[in-house]
Amino acid sequence: MIADINISEKSFGDKILMTNVKFSIDDGEKIGIVGRNGIGKSTLFNILSGSDKDFSGEIVFRRGVSVASTAQEHHNLADISVINYILNGLPEYASLSKIINEYPSFMGDNIRLINEYSEALDRFNQKDFYQIEEKIKRELGNFQLENVYNQPMESLSGGQKRLVEIIKIMHSNVHLALIYEPTNHMDYVAKQQFIDWVKSQAVSNVSMLIITHDRDVLGKVDRIIELKNGGSTSYSGNYDSYLKQNAMETSSGMVNFEQVERRITSLKQKVLDYQRLKEKSRNQSTIQRFKRLENSARDELSELEKREKPSFWIDKDSIEKLNYKTAARYEKFKSKNIRVNLRSSEARSKRVVASAKNATIGYSDKILLENINIDLRENEILELRGRNGAGKTTLIKALLNYGCDLHLADKNNLDNLPTVYDGELWINPDIRIGVYEQEISDKYLNLSLKNAIEQLYLDKNLPISDTKIRQLCSDYLFTSTDLDIPIMQLSGGQKARFQIISILANDPQLLILDEPTNHLDLPSIEELESALMRYSGAIIYVSHDNYFRQKLKGEVLALG
């Protein structure tokens, strides 16, 4: 065992986030961390990395254990280059480099310092650190970041910084790696490379905690720990094993919860019965006896009613395998999920909604796409597939810019819009469109959630009311306190849910989705998949989530 985690309480103001998070980490163990958006996964990593010490409990690492984590935010980077940022984040490389670079200037004839210097040289050579910069350069190329090697970190996009963090952790050579949402912004090649690296670390005894809802990654872990109900539950095995164990545990938990509910009902009736018997009695000792029984029932009732309802979620495939009684119980007690309301009952036509004929597209005389042909009709699905930089987002922007008059997040910056040099692009002007982009329009970022929803409806010339806003927030699991939070301060999962509200506002007949599962938790991803599979309109989508792609399927347009 390299670490023992025991968090007895973690709070934010009056909100208690954790009350009983306990688990240990073994040598070489690969653990996936899952849980609903806002449950405390990021907070757990902040505690484990030492950046958050405001909690009750104890984190014990085995002596000598080194820990590295992917940074979630980047501040005060000054002008540090990408390569230096990565090298500074490699604990052993940094410490050995310090000795090798600094000792010659002052060690003189000091035997101890000479020995330390000699040992550092041997270790540096043993770890092949003389080649580390070349290895990192190749890795940057594999992640399509070959041109950022000497660029300042602060000049990179959020997605590029995330990939740099992954490269840093892949070369960190630590005992425990804390990895946050690694595959967001990765294409399918980079993602497979990351998964291969995770599998390869089995022989090097590196332990990992990976916060992710990427089911491809969760399929390669040794254990999954789910944060729920203020605590943590451990499931041995990978994602498929987790689903089976979770279904069994949830079924058992619902039986226990139902028994508690019955006990509460029984106790409430007993309190009333004892009150009536007490009032009817004329014997003082009998009155006292009923009073004691009433108080005892009230005390037990009070304790039971303090218990919060547990979180109950079972994946849809496992639900189909439940017996009738358990399935009915689940419908009664299941945790609330987002409600994705998409048109599914309308008569389905086969009219063309989008087309491209021998289109050539690019930026500033640089051609990215040639001979693009699309014939998309209602109730059809088109997947755009290719590596990052292959032109998927470019094609989407070109369709929306040339095919119709639709506001894009960067529409005001004409330099960022592609040019169609040849051929035709067209979107049916009679259909309504919903677009899920990876970035939220700047004009919404400083608005509160409530005002942003109101504004997006006004932008689409749609009626909106306070009642409607509150209903939408309820449907997408926002609380009343979330209404006043600026969009830019929402979590990744909350921003994703706001995006879904935005794209569905006008009851679209064509959905254009650019990595829609990024940041969503597992139940929300599953609900989105189910809604899209029932959808009667047309879909153009980009996704590197293999589970999501297998559900939606559709024709594939390979780019690059």
Pin down the residues of each PLM region.
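ABC ATP-binding cassette signature C-motif
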Residues: 1-257, 336-560
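Flexible nucleotide-interacting loop at or near the entrance of a catalytic core
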Residues: 114-133, 251-367
